[in-house]
């Protein structure tokens, strides 16, 4: 790969020389930082198995190299990269994979290590959604995830990625993460805090990432990280697992933050060593059992991951000063719930007891049952998935519900050709040679749901959301 010029402040280089173990070469560190980052993807096992995905893309000639810490993760090389961006492939558009940097798959691998099966998980700094969607896949879309994002502009992107991947067990919030220890004390089985950081590990992706770097800013960021970790630790139930991670390399934002928590809460904090997380993990292992991944070790972004267990309860934090307000939804039960369920099943939308029906005026929603005990304690930006809007003639089923719940082998499923699927993504009506028999059509491609539509005469009326419609060259090569 070609080298690219990375800006390194002198003080940063001095700090890295001090932080790097003697077993690693500083020259190799500089060389690795100058190389462009390898592309990588994670297969979305909520929609397709790894084996089936590999068989599906075999004709494309993509070269996939397994990522050792993530069974469904692969580094990818493509000869057709310039002709067709990875994000415009049919498999990406239908949510079969997520474009995710390899090292950022590490925190979720650590969260679920040692056969850990949490039912209620918080992703405290969730956008753009790579780790939230990875958590959802590991949970099999069961239980519940509270995905929080402090940046308002990034919440929309987070929701879009969750929807594309067909995830139904998630609630979104928009808070400073420091509120959760007080607002939701000891409510979570597992918490991921992928903390905001100085981003020293991302120079392979952004050569100018260190333009505004300074030792003083590292210390300021570390102070915020300690407050976030303190909040997360209070929100974790006794016996629960917390993973703290960053994409930076200095010890102040990494080891020192975790050691501060141990010093503060002593025996309530147990560090869980990560040396057995995957083959060769010991190459990045610190004396404390953390993973401090310098970019030359595994040829990926720089990263830090620590895993710990909460051994006992803590005194409660002061109660939050905000009011949540009245919850605008009511549970849908009895005959009404049965009617909605039967109508949804008739068009191929299926769910189980993990999701419960709720209603707000004419809107019908599905909430993960595991999140319901948090209602009234925190304000949600979005909870579960919107299933339908009721009207005089029945229900208008929502796109995100179709992607998450539709059964592609249902009697109303209608498989499109590649050209027809591309027309669908462009927002155009479909004129199949042999129209479907049913009026309500579950449109699929590669046996994946693309949406619910109406057959009108010989055409299928496009229902793809306008905000998702794609322009330019897509997977058939036509513009």
Curated annotation (Swiss-Prot):
EC number(s) stated in the UniProt entry for this protein: 2.1.1.178
Protein name: Ribosomal RNA small subunit methyltransferase F
Subcellular location: Cytoplasm
Organism field: Salmonella paratyphi B (strain ATCC BAA-1250 / SPB7)
Keywords associated with the record: Cytoplasm, Methyltransferase, RNA-binding, rRNA processing, S-adenosyl-L-methionine, Transferase
Database matches in Gene3D superfamilies: 3.10.450.720, Vaccinia Virus protein VP39
Tagged with keyword Acyltransferase: no
Assigned protein family: Belongs to the class I-like SAM-binding methyltransferase superfamily. RsmB/NOP family.
Binding residues annotated for S-adenosyl-L-methionine, in chain numbering: 125-131, 149, 176, 194
HAMAP family given in the database record: 16SrRNA_methyltr_F
Pfam families for the chain: Methyltr_RsmB-F, Methyltr_RsmF_N, Methyltranf_PUA, YebU_pre-PUA_dom
GO MF entries: RNA binding; rRNA (cytosine-C5-)-methyltransferase activity
Functional summary from the UniProt entry: Specifically methylates the cytosine at position 1407 (m5C1407) of 16S rRNA.
Active site annotation, chain numbering: 247 (nucleophile)
Any one annotated GO CC term: cytoplasm
Organismal lineage: Bacteria, Pseudomonadati, Pseudomonadota, Gammaproteobacteria, Enterobacterales
GO biological process: rRNA base methylation
Record InterPro entries: Methyltr_RsmF_N, MeTrfase_RsmB-F_NOP2_cat, MeTrfase_RsmB-F_NOP2_dom, Nol1_Nop2_Fmu_2, Nop2p, RCMT, rRNA_ssu_MeTfrase_F, RsmB/NOL1/NOP2-like_CS
Catalytic activities: cytidine(1407) in 16S rRNA + S-adenosyl-L-methionine = 5-methylcytidine(1407) in 16S rRNA + S-adenosyl-L-homocysteine + H(+)
């Amino acid at each position: 790969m070609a080298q690219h010029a990375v800006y390194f402040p002198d003080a940063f280089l001095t700090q890295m020389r001090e932080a790097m173990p003697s077993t690693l070469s500083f020259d190799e560190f500089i060389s690795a930082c100058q190389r462009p980052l390898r592309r990588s993807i994670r297969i979305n096992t909520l929609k397709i198995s790894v084996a089936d995905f590999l068989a599906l893309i075999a004709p494309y000639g993509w070269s996939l190299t397994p990522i050792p810490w993530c069974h469904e993760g692969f580094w990818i090389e493509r000869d057709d990269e310039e002709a067709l961006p990875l994000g415009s492939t049919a498999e990406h558009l239908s949510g079969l994979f997520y474009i995710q940097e390899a090292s950022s798959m590490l925190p979720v691998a650590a969260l679920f290590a040692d056969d850990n099966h949490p039912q209620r998980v918080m992703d405290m700094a969730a956008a753009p959604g790579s780790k939230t969607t990875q958590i959802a896949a590991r949970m099999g879309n069961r239980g519940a995830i509270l995905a929080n994002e402090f940046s308002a502009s990034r919440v929309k992107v987070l929701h879009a990625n969750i929807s594309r991947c067909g995830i139904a067990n998630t609630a979104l919030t928009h808070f400073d993460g420091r509120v959760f220890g007080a607002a939701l004390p000891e409510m979570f089985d597992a918490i991921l805090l992928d903390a905001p950081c100085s981003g020293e590990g991302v120079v392979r992706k952004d050569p100018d990432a260190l333009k505004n770097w300074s030792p003083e800013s590292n210390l300021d960021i570390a102070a915020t990280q300690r407050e976030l970790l303190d909040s997360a630790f209070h929100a974790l139930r006794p016996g629960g697992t917390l993973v703290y991670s960053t994409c930076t390399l200095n010890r102040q934002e990494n080891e020192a933050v975790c050691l501060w928590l141990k010093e503060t809460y002593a025996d309530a904090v147990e560090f869980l060593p990560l040396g057995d997380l995957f083959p060769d993990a010991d190459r990045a292992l610190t004396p404390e059992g953390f993973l401090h991944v310098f970019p030359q070790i595994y040829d990926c972004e720089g990263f830090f991951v620590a895993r710990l267990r909460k051994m006992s309860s803590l005194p409660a934090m002061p109660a939050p000063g905000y009011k949540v307000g009245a919850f605008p939804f009511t549970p849908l039960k009895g005959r009404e719930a049965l009617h909605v369920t039967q109508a949804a099943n008739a068009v191929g939308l299926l769910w189980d007891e993990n999701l419960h029906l709720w209603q707000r005026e004419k809107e019908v929603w599905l909430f993960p049952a595991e999140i319901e005990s948090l209602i009234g304690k925190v304000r949600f930006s979005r909870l579960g998935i919107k299933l339908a809007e009721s009207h005089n003639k029945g229900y208008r089923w929502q796109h995100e519900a179709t992607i998450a719940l539709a059964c592609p082998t249902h009697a109303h499923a209608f498989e499109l050709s590649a050209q027809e699927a591309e027309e669908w993504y462009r927002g155009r009506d479909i004129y199949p040679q042999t129209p479907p028999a049913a009026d309500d059509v579950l449109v699929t491609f590669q046996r994946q749901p693309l949406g619910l539509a109406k057959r009108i005469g010989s055409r299928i009326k496009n229902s793809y959301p306008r905000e998702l419609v794609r322009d330019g060259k897509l997977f058939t090569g036509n513009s």
